[in-house]
């Protein structure tokens, strides 16, 4: 007895089913997360300063990999949108990212928009050589100490480090900071 061919409706149904699975599998493959860097999120961004959150279990070598990826993006095409950073100089379409400063934290409270604004306000006060209140000075120190790493990009030059935010009043050699790369200051 010869085999009976599939009914056209069954054939269409199987084609739709297999096509759907193929589309879903292809979409999942194409939209998979980048596993070469640790998971991260942009907690907040104020102008050129970006607070990045990584999970608490992220190791220093993983954070170094993330910082080096930012360096690679800055060196290759100067467009940090692929790294979830909004343009820092949106008024200039030729150079959307003239300067980017990243601070990496494990504790999400330090990446909140209000916390970053408060830190930047204390930084502006300190830069103006005005006296900070005891509370604000303590907050500033704690914010800087809580950072796990940082990255600075300025017109194609970069600096990356592991450790707290460097205190400009103390030489970096005396701080608990590991400089990964630094070409901000020409040799």
Language-model-detected regions and their locations in the chain:
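N-terminal Lys/Arg-rich, disordered targeting/topogenic segments
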Residues: 1-9
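Hydrophobic membrane-insertion alpha-helices, especially the h-region
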Residues: 11-30
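Generic detector of low-complexity/intrinsically disordered segments
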Residues: 16-19, 122, 164
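Short linear motifs at secondary-structure transitions and domain/linker junctions
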Residues: 24-31, 75-81
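Ser/Thr/Pro/Gly-rich low-complexity linker/stalk segments immediately outside membranes or between
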Residues: 29-45
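Acidic/histidine-rich, surface-exposed loop or edge segments in extracytoplasmic proteins
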Residues: 43-58
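Mature extracytoplasmic domains of secretory-pathway proteins
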Residues: 56-143
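C-terminal partner/receptor-binding element of secreted or periplasmic proteins
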Residues: 130-187
């Amino acid at each position: 007895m010869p085999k009976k061919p599939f009914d056209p409706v069954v054939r269409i149904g199987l084609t739709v089913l297999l096509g759907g699975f193929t589309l879903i599998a292809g979409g999942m493959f194409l939209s998979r997360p980048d596993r070469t860097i640790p998971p991260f999120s942009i907690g907040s961004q104020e102008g050129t300063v970006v607070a990045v959150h990584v999970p608490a279990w992220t190791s220093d070598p993983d954070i170094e990999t993330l910082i080096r990826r930012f360096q690679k993006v800055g060196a290759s095409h100067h467009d940090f949108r692929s790294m979830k950073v909004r343009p820092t100089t949106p008024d200039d379409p030729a150079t959307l990212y003239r300067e980017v400063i990243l601070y990496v934290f494990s504790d999400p409270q330090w990446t909140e928009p209000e916390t970053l604004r408060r830190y930047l306000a204390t930084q502006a006060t300190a830069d103006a050589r005005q006296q900070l209140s005891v509370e604000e000075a303590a907050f500033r120190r704690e914010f800087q100490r809580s950072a796990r790493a940082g990255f600075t990009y300025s017109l194609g030059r970069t600096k990356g480090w592991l450790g707290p935010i460097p205190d400009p009043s103390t030489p970096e050699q005396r701080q608990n900071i590991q400089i990964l790369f630094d070409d901000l200051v020409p040799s």
